[in-house]
Amino acid sequence: MTIRNQRFSLLKQPISSTLNQHLVDYPTPSNLSYWWGFGSLAGICLVIQIVTGVFLAMHYTPHVDLAFNSVEHIMRDVEGGWLLRYMHANGASMFFIVVYLHIFRGLYYASYSSPREFVWCLGVVIFLLMIVTAFIGYVLPWGQMSFWGATVITSLASAIPVVGDTIVTWLWGGFSVDNATLNRFFSLHYLLPFILVGASLLHLAALHQYGSNNPLGVHSEMDKIAFYPYFYVKDLVGWVAFAIFFSIWIFYAPNVLGHPDNYIPANPMSTPPHIVPEWYFLPIYAILRSIPDKAGGVAAIALVFICLLALPFFKSMYVRSSSFRPIYQGMFWLLLADCLLLGWIGCQPVEAPFVTIGQISSLVFFLFFAITPILGRVGRGIPNSYTDETDHT
């Protein structure tokens, strides 16, 4: 190719060459399984949420007297509005399902270990942003569960010493959840997804700095192939399966993952018998409720994210993949079962025996992160790379 042809080649242009480097020619370990397809699925979910959210915002009115009716207007009067709303509402659930599977895959294969510490920490930040975005989005329909969920969760900020009450007043825009709160939440709910896009691009760039982990947990620069067409085709299978799964929820069970009380307009004078957040918040909500003291519950929630952020810095792991670490593998499955149990406890009333079960489950959750550094020293498996001859004993 001549110098002139190189200059006008599409793949030599700055933007297209960057896309080609990261999405086409990106060297990928040849043994990646379908568990590595959830990253691209998460990106698809984010795009779905942004596109449907933009169209919903065209018809939504962020006012306490009109918000609930505007949602019903979307459902009844806007052409295709019911589809937009169900895609957006169930899309949030699909997004969290994909991300939870992505996180647990990372835990199982120790994708957080060196040199991918920054990738994992960015992922935790993205997860936290998702939680905040989903919570404030759940408030926007202004139903009973929206209003009382906002009241309960935002009041938790009052547990912060010195500045807690000031933060709550700032969040509310007054002395109670009202019109100012709804306007603030709508504005933030529109903004945060675009911040999520930026954080996701940073996450992808950080991943591509050192390359993807693999099921064996070993590092090699030799056994790699181009991402396109091999893993595009492999991811396509996951995309089709996801589309079928997503469609079943949208067309056959659009309200199963929601709460019926949210079809009742918000009434500050009537408290629901049982305030329950969306299902994807339930494990964290159960940990919050397991501690009677408000400040202790908030501290426990903060500790959850601190544990996740600290996980890559437990410098004690000689072997990454759980396939070669039977003790850690058992602890991983215990953690997964414990999180499912916490999710069930989160939707139960605050009474015996659910409180006790929640406290025990919360303790097991934190014990996993306390024991992980010790488990890294137990057992001996394959080396860090094909050429690593270092004796770790």
UniProtKB/Swiss-Prot annotation:
Cofactor note: Binds 2 heme b groups non-covalently.
Positions annotated to bind heme b b562: H88, H189
Residues reported to bind heme b b566: H102, H203
Spans within the Mitochondrial matrix topological domain: 1-33, 109-116, 211-229, 315-325, 371-393
Cellular component GO terms held in the UniProt record: membrane; mitochondrial inner membrane; respiratory chain complex III
Binding site for a ubiquinone: H208
Gene3D superfamilies registered for this protein in UniProt: Cytochrome Bc1 Complex, Chain C
GO biological process: mitochondrial electron transport, ubiquinol to cytochrome c
GO MF entries: metal ion binding; ubiquinol-cytochrome-c reductase activity
Bilayer topology: Multi-pass membrane protein
Keywords noted in UniProt: Electron transport, Heme, Iron, Membrane, Metal-binding, Mitochondrion, Mitochondrion inner membrane, Respiratory chain, Transmembrane, Transmembrane helix, Transport, Ubiquinone
Any matching Pfam family: Cytochrome_B
Role noted for this protein: Component of the ubiquinol-cytochrome c oxidoreductase, a multisubunit transmembrane complex that is part of the mitochondrial electron transport chain which drives oxidative phosphorylation.
Assigned protein family: Belongs to the cytochrome b family.
Oligomer and partners: Component of the ubiquinol-cytochrome c oxidoreductase (cytochrome b-c1 complex, complex III, CIII), a multisubunit enzyme composed of 10 subunits. The complex is composed of 3 respiratory subunits cytochrome b (MT-CYB), cytochrome c1 (CYC1-1 or CYC1-2) and Rieske protein (UCR1-1 or UCR1-2), 2 core protein subunits MPPalpha1 (or MPPalpha2) and MPPB, and 5 low-molecular weight protein subunits QCR7-1 (or QCR7-2), UCRQ-1 (or UCRQ-2), QCR9, UCRY and probably QCR6-1 (or QCR6-2).
Other facts: A stretch of 270 kb of the mitochondrial genome is duplicated within the centromere of chromosome 2 resulting in the duplication of the gene. The expression of this duplicated gene (At2g07727) is not demonstrated. It is also probably not RNA edited and therefore differs in all the positions known to be edited. Heme 1 (or BL or b562) is low-potential and absorbs at about 562 nm, and heme 2 (or BH or b566) is high-potential and absorbs at about 566 nm.
Protein known as: Cytochrome b
Species the sequence originates in: Arabidopsis thaliana
